[in-house]
Amino acid sequence: GHAEKSILNKMNIKHRRNWHINSWVDLCKIMMDEIIVVNGALNFGLKSVARAMYNHDMISTCWNNEMNGLQAMETMIDCEEIARKQNKRFQDLKHVKDVMKYNEVDCKVMWEIISYFREKI
């Protein structure tokens, strides 16, 4: 989506890097363009599709909390400030670990969805 591209651009500026991704794949767009629907999915969003597929035993991974992408980003911003003020390592903060797990599940769910459709379609 758009957010990932914007975040990458901001990180390149902030860290004076030139990380470049030639090809972005938007799973939501693919599902909408190909009209792939899953019984129980209320929309084409990752969480809705993944939860529906999980409920139908089509994938084996799902989130165990109610965090969303915006909350994850806000948490990381807050943790950066907390780590600085408390002179702690950013990656040692509990909330950072929670966001890392949330993002890990995001990636694993996308991989399982893609794998499922590659195998079944």
Predicted segments with their positions:
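DEDD superfamily 3′-5′ metal-dependent exonuclease/proofreading module
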Residues: 1-121
